[in-house]
């Protein structure tokens, strides 16, 4: 069974930050294949520090990295970019959502 906490339910839950794409990369792709960060970095032709920082949740998945991951794993770049966008949005909602709702008024029709 997957250890990843990414589910449709989690994405829809406004009080919870969705999983960072690095956790998904580690739990659903690297570990099952027994692949190291260094091996993936070599295969993608990127610095190991980039992949390591993504796996640790310290760096976002960029469009360039999404293209490389998609090519290597047979996924789509949108898969990786959507994971990043959902993570960023839920994190921003948790950190700033109330202040934004309080400070920004909807445009009058």
Predicted feature residues:
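Short alpha-helical "recognition helix" segments of helix-turn-helix
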Residues: 36-42, 69
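Recognition helix of helix-turn-helix/homeodomain-like DNA-binding domains
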Residues: 45-61, 68-70
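DNA major-groove recognition helix of helix-turn-helix/homeodomain DNA-binding modules
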Residues: 64-82
